[in-house]
């Protein structure tokens, strides 16, 4: 149990699957921020995909269904069917890698990283937004609630809107993600209204419902109980010719290349925040390289949605 909400993600293997790369760059914001780099396990001079595909598959029902729906599976003693039902819903909703339906890798990864690394717990995923709540025409990819304590010991809450982009070039991924953030910002009143009207029905635990009510419905003459923030998952092509380097050197090359890339692009992310007057928001950015971003994001989700994974 987090600070009020339960985590939906099964994250115990996350640190084994996603290797974090330490660096010294930041966004220079006055608000809270994260700028974190990860890569998959390197094996035989390439990123090993099997583990992440299995992990996503095992989390698919937690991604697709609300807490209330998952509890219904439990009460019906039918939890074993939740994964297959979730996959069926996704296949009915669209093809693997179809953006906007919840079937694109970035849409699932931004949910996973905001829950697993930020501890901002899910209110709605992209699948839920597109299947359960289409009338609201949400442009977010996931919506989360973060409850934290600042350096002075004062608690604060943030409604975190997630977006993602996975494409060959990191700069292009940043540009695309900020285009999406601006769309979310332009529709923020509608997004917040949707959460306020529907979030309680998606919970089942009375304590969680009461916790959300205290945040989303302020008492008379009281100010807002939360701010809005943005979470980004960015994927790009690594750009290292693995045939030219021995296997034992490849991971060191990956780490060095990622640090070089973030040194180049962190100022650009900060610039995008500044020029779009977004500096009053917290930003949480998670970056993962691929061997071939376009092919890998399709291949991973195709295997997950087919159930063609290693268990």
Locate each region found by the language model:
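Glycine- and acidic-residue-rich phosphate-binding/metal-coordinating active-site segment common to enzymes
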Residues: 123, 130-214
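Acidic, metal/cofactor-coordinating or nucleic-acid-engaging core segments within structured domains
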Residues: 174-267
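Extended hydrophobic secondary-structure segments that form protein cores and membrane-embedded regions
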Residues: 161-163, 229-235, 284-289
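A structured, charge-rich N-terminal accessory region that forms the first stable segment of a protein
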Residues: 2-85
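Extended, Lys/Arg-enriched charged tracts that mediate electrostatic binding to polyanionic substrates
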Residues: 105-137
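Extended, charged low-complexity segments
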Residues: 244-311
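A short, highly charged nucleic-acid-interacting micro-segment common to nuclease
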Residues: 88-111
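Short acidic, S/G/P-rich loop/turn micro-motifs used as interaction or catalytic elements
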Residues: 46, 167-169, 238-242, 293
């Amino acid at each position: 149990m987090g600070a009020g909400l339960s985590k939906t993600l099964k994250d115990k293997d996350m640190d084994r699957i996603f290797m974090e790369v330490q660096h010294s760059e930041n966004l220079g914001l006055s608000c809270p921020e994260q700028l974190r780099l990860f890569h998959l396990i390197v094996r035989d001079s390439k990123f090993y995909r099997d583990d992440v595909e299995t992990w996503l598959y095992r989390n698919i029902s937690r991604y697709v269904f609300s807490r209330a729906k998952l509890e219904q599976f439990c009460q019906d003693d039918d939890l074993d069917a939740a994964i297959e039902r979730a996959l069926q819903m996704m296949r009915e909703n669209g093809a693997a890698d179809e953006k906007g339906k919840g079937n694109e890798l970035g849409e699932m990864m931004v949910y996973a990283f905001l829950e697993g690394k930020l501890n901002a717990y899910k209110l709605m995923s992209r699948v839920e937004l597109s299947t359960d709540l289409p009338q609201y025409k949400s442009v977010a990819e996931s919506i989360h609630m973060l409850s934290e304590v600042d350096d002075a010991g004062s608690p604060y809450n943030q409604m975190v809107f997630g977006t993602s982009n996975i494409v060959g070039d990191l700069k292009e991924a940043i540009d695309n993600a900020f285009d999406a953030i601006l769309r979310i910002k332009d529709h923020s009143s509608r997004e917040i209204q949707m959460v306020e009207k529907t979030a309680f029905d998606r919970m089942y635990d009375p304590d969680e419902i009461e916790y959300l009510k205290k945040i989303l419905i302020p008492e008379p003459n009281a100010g807002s109980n939360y701010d809005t923030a943005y979470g980004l998952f960015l994927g790009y092509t690594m750009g290292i010719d693995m045939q030219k380097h021995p296997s034992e050197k490849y991971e060191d090359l990956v780490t060095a290349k990622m640090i070089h890339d973030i040194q180049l692009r962190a100022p650009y992310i900060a610039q995008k925040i500044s020029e779009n007057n977004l500096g009053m928001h917290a930003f949480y950015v998670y970056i993962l390289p691929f061997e071939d971003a376009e092919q890998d994001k399709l291949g991973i989700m195709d295997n997950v949605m087919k159930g063609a994974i290693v268990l």
